[in-house]
């Protein structure tokens, strides 16, 4: 808002000065000052009254007022929040005092709180509660947000102050964590166009603006296909499916006003059990194609053209900074350091993974032939026949295991682990005390179980629904800081479990249980943070998966098995012989899991190290996989047209390798626990 008003008054001043220089100059300066004051009054009024901007109040250090949130307030909130932040930035940049850590770096850490609150609501509307109305607002606002960001990163006076602090003698007097904040702040500007001038700076900003539009469209196109493509089946097509899966599919159909039918929604949690258990091969193929063709249906929501433009713009942008390719720029400040080091790790594992897939396919084909099924193993057969082999070889039925994996019990198991490792205690908060964005969401207070001190809040949004993006993820509304008084974290976990019929328990697969623990690891990272400054929360991308992958190891520890793996009907604990069968099958199907992941990670890196001029993403994906020797019997975990990790934003672009990089760290850490006297619950190692 403020930027638009200033631009208008500047043009008016120029017009006046052309006719009456002296008088116009005086009047225009007065007009500009009055207009600026008026605009800031409007901004301050919005911050005080707009539900998306107001300070969070209530218990637990203040919480987001989701019960008062309305899309009607979003545009005004974003505009006012950006204007307020730019006013703060201008004050920092034009401070007449010499630049110091306190008046420049800490001042920047402190700035922008109202807009940060708005983006907490934005994140929920984007990922958990999307709608056509929000997507239209998102389309309109994303370019403005990009322009606002460029206005900050290309503020020459601001960057000069940051650089002065970075190069000053004061750096030697700062604590290590303060030095790290300065380093990250400087890099955040220098690596994002602050050193550019003239046409190069203008082009850099224009590229970022266009990328913001493309990233938004990519994500919304995938979400559209997840909502629009639902496979409905009838009672005579349920062969092979368990009662719990059938019940979940019936509930999903009922929610869509298709009573008497069964809905396989276009999400992994819904697709996976169908491909694993359904005897209907034609339907397995239909469900498989529906899922893996998200964003690739040749219609207005097709993402291939967007991918090409995204890659071209990213490459051009880093070229302005002097880099050979996007991956070189991206990995420069990551643990891997260079694309070559990341590629070396992945390519070292790839041949063994593919060889294992070939063995798995041979076993499946032999089983199919023995059964007289008269088929050649195809991608929609992989899960189905591997499940048959698992049952034959290990006497292990995934459906049998699911009877011991109730969502509520697994949640309690995670709380137990967090208590043993971090001394955290999770206490459910009565519904209605803390506002939530959907009735499915529940909140727990996290305290130190020894001292009783408040740590933060944990929100859980467990179920799939229309408007919620697929997959599982962790996020936060507030991170821990102490530089300006202690702030307590507000952390969230989000899943897409299929909601059962009312009164029915939520049973989940072993893979989903593993993912549940994985994402809780991210939440624990947020809750256990102990840093002074906001910039220090998180970590480099190829490290951030370490803590989440490590927590997966606690899913199958004895205390969790003995106390939380209980049968849904009998309440009996999982028998030892079933535990032994699960242990025996621990590495079963690893060819599939490793190869589908690595294919995505390798294609990501090849995309971002290749000249993207005239690139055809569909052909590039196909030719790259062929060159790698990708088995025909399985796809990438994320095909390019729905690879949101790398194309709906830049968080994981040229960075999907990070899961494998972190797995190396995870193996070392897990070994340290395993060798400790107290095992995975050893206090000293924890």
Residue ranges and their predicted role:
Residues 25-243, 248, 679:
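N-terminal helix-rich structural modules
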Residues 406, 497-517:
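Short pre-active-site segment immediately N-terminal to the catalytic Zn-binding motif
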Residues 1-27:
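Gram-negative bacterial Sec-dependent N-terminal signal peptides
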Residues 36-73, 80, 240, 261-263, ...:
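C-terminal, non-catalytic "cap/extension" segments appended to globular domains
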Residues 58-73, 122-141, 164-206, 265-305, ...:
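Short His/Asp/Glu-rich catalytic/ion-coordination signatures at enzyme active sites or charged loops
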Residues 177, 181, 213, 220, ...:
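Active-site-proximal, well-structured secondary-structure segments within enzyme catalytic domains
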Residues 72, 76-94, 106, 110-113, ...:
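A broad, structural surface signal
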């Amino acid at each position: 808002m403020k930027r638009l008003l200033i631009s208008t008054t500047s043009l008016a001043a120029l017009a006046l000065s052309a006719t009456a220089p002296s008088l116009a100059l005086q009047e225009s300066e007065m007009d500009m000052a009055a207009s600026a004051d008026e605009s800031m009054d409007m901004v301050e009024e919005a911050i005080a009254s707009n539900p998306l901007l107001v300070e969070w109040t209530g218990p637990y250090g203040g919480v987001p007022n989701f019960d008062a949130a309305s899309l009607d307030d979003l545009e005004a909130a974003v505009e006012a929040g950006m204007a307020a932040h730019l006013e703060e930035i201008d004050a920092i940049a034009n401070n007449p005092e010499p630049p110091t850590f306190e008046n420049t770096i800490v001042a920047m850490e402190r700035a922008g709180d109202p807009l940060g609150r708005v983006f907490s609501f934005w994140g929920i509307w984007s990922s958990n509660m999307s709608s056509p109305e929000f997507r239209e607002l998102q389309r309109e606002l994303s370019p403005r947000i990009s322009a606002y960001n460029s206005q900050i990163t290309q503020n020459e006076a601001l960057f000069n102050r940051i650089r002065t602090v970075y190069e000053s003698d004061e750096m030697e007097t700062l604590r290590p964590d303060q030095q790290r904040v300065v380093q990250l702040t400087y890099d955040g500007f220098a690596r994002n166009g602050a050193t550019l001038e003239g046409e190069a700076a203008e082009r850099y900003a224009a590229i970022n603006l266009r990328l913001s539009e493309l990233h938004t469209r990519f994500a919304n196109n995938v979400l559209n296909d997840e909502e629009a493509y639902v496979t409905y089946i009838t009672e005579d097509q349920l062969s092979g499916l368990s009662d719990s899966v059938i019940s979940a599919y019936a509930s999903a159909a009922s929610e869509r006003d298709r009573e008497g039918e069964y809905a396989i929604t276009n999400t992994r949690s819904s697709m996976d059990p169908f491909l694993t258990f359904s005897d209907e091969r034609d339907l397995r193929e239909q469900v498989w194609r529906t899922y893996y063709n998200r964003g690739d249906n040749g219609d207005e929501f097709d993402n291939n053209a967007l991918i090409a433009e995204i890659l071209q713009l990213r490459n051009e942008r880093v070229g302005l900074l002097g880099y050979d390719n996007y991956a070189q720029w991206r990995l420069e400040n990551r643990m891997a350091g260079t694309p070559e080091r990341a590629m070396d790790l992945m390519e070292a594992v790839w041949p063994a993974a593919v060889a294992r897939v070939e063995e798995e396919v041979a076993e499946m084909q032999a089983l199919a032939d023995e059964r007289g099924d008269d088929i050649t193993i195809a991608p929609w057969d992989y899960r189905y026949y591997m499940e048959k082999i698992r049952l034959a070889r290990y006497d292990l039925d995934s459906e049998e295991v699911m009877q011991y994996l109730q969502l509520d019990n697994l949640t309690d198991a995670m709380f137990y682990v967090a208590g043993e490792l971090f001394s955290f205690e999770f206490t459910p908060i009565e519904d209605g005390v803390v506002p939530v964005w959907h009735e499915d969401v529940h909140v727990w207070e996290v305290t130190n179980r020894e001292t009783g001190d408040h740590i933060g809040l944990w929100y859980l949004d467990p179920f799939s629904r229309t408007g919620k993006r697929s997959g599982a993820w962790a996020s936060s509304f507030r991170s821990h800081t102490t530089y300006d008084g202690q702030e307590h974290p507000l952390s969230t976990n989000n899943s897409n479990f299929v909601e059962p019929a009312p009164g029915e328990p939520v049973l989940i697969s072993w893979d989903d249980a593993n993912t549940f623990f994985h994402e809780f690891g991210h939440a624990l990272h947020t809750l256990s943070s102990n840093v002074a400054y906001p910039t220090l929360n998180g970590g480099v991308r190829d490290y951030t998966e370490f803590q989440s992958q490590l927590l997966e190891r606690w899913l199958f520890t004895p205390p969790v098995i003995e106390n939380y793996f209980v049968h849904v009907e009998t309440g009996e604990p999982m028998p030892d012989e079933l535990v032994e069968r699960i242990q025996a099958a621990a590495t079963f199907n690893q060819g599939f899991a490793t190869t589908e992941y690595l294919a995505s990670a390798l294609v990501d890196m090849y995309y971002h190290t290749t000249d993207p001029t005239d690139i055809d993403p569909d052909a590039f994906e196909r030719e790259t996989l062929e060159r790698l020797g990708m088995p025909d019997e399985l796809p990438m975990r994320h095909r390019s047209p729905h690879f949101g990790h790398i194309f709906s934003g830049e968080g994981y672009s040229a960075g999907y390798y990070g899961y494998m990089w972190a797995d190396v760290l995870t193996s070392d850490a897990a070994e340290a626990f395993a060798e400790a006297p107290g095992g995975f619950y050893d206090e000293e190692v924890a």
